[in-house]
Amino acid sequence: MIKKFKLPKNWRTQLIIEEYRYSRKELEYRLKLKDKDIGYLSVLKKGKYFFVKVVSVIPEMRGKGCGSMLYEHAINQLGRLSTNYHAASSLAQRVWIRLIKKYEHTDEFFTGILTVYKKKD
């Protein structure tokens, strides 16, 4: 029998994002609730770009804003975040569409690279 994950009432205030740096070019942000991994976002630096490699959120936490929280944390930490938009899944594209409404962005049409920038204070 699979044990269902139960959320505490104030779960959003208990979330922690930890950074793991694997090299100068590769890092990961992990979203945790207490000791449970909720999701992660992996980034690879290529030249001036910080490309999202993988984003994953456990099924029980999908649709609750956890993925968006990881994207926004990465943007705020790195200053910008990029994707090859046409290679992104339809779910990821929906997140990117929400991000471009909130952040400055550039779209390099011929390369298919979409970059979202942290707003200047």
Where are these predicted regions, by residue range?
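Conserved acetyl-CoA-binding loop-helix of GNAT-fold acetyltransferases
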Residues: 57, 63-76
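Conserved N-terminal entry element of GNAT/NAT acetyltransferase domains
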Residues: 1-19
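C-terminal "cap" of GNAT-fold acetyltransferases
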Residues: 108-121
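Conserved acetyl-CoA binding element of GNAT-fold acetyltransferases
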Residues: 48-59, 84
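Conserved donor-binding loop and adjoining core beta-sheet/short helix segment
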Residues: 33-53
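Conserved GNAT acetyl-CoA-binding A-motif
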Residues: 49, 76-91
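Conserved active-site tyrosine of GNAT-family acetyltransferases
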Residues: 96, 100
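Conserved beta-hairpin
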Residues: 16-20, 24-39
